[in-house]
Amino acid sequence: MIQAQIDLHGLVSDEARSYVSSFIGDCKKRGIRCVRIVHGKGLGSRNREPVLKNKLRSWLIQKDEVIAYAQAKKQDGGAGAVIVLLKN
């Protein structure tokens, strides 16, 4: 069950990275374990390529608080979102 979410639409890479880090830290403090991070499909970016989608996956790998992540189901955002499981 998704307990919290953030939406990175409209953010540049550095802003998004900082926002994700703060969000994950806050969720950890609050005991939240399952979150959705909406990064978008990249349709509004230059060359219509997903910039944040690929960077987000790289950032999540580096976070000790993250156990696992996967692309969201279609009804939860599909290719435009990631579901993240955080440590207790």
Question: Locations of the language-model features?
Answer:
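Long, charged, low-complexity intrinsically disordered regions
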Residues: 1-34, 38-88
